[in-house]
Amino acid sequence: SEMCIRDSFSVDQKNEIRFMYILPFSKNKALVEYTLFSSSLIDDKEYESEIKSYLKQKHITDYTILDKEKGLIPMTCYPFFEKNTDSYFKIGTAGGWTKPSTGYTVKNSLDKIDLILNYLKKDKPLSKISFKNRFWYYDLLFLDVIIESKGNGSKVFSDLFRNNDPIKIFKFLDEKTSFREELSIFLSVNVMTFVRSLFKRILNFSI
């Protein structure tokens, strides 16, 4: 929703990337989520305290908590698929199917399942499957930029949605864009930060 995009990064970043969003289910029910890109965990009490403070800033004080949940999502480009064999094939999060830049797993998994089925139908060895497409490299550079941003990474997210049609951004995150569309997205943010990360990877032979 508009509120999700506009307000998500208004919270204190605390030298990380932290954002809050409200996903309404009806006129009086909603999911309120506090998310961090972090290399360390925080106490549950801090999560709840930050959510309460956020709601108070929005003048939301009369509410009932119906349920609570939490989760940890590995945001990594580690090539789990390189450990696969023709008879042993990891899937889901264990197989590296969680999209590194967003944490999306379900949509990503459906696409990868289609690829696996195609290999099986053609009797091709599963060990030959590699998920290193251009989007994998985009995610790799994106994570580099986030790690090196020292708390300013939220600007990358904000610029993406502020300077582009949200539909195109979600299409990009679903890995359905053309290279031409991707180029226009890259040029809408501080592209030099990604270029520097790319050259650093090339110089270190780590790409």
Tell what function each PLM region has.
Residues 114-207:
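C-terminal helical "tail/cap" subdomain of flavin- and related membrane-associated enzymes
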Residues 29-30:
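Hydrophobic residues embedded in beta-strands of well-ordered beta-sheets
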Residues 23-26:
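A short, hydrophobic, proline-anchored segment that marks a local hinge/packing element in signaling
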Residues 12-14, 38-115:
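FAD/FMN-dependent oxidoreductases across multiple families
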Residues 2-5:
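Short, small-residue-biased leader/transition segments that mark boundaries at the very start
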Residues 33:
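A basic- and aromatic-enriched beta-loop-alpha substructure that forms the phosphate/nucleotide-
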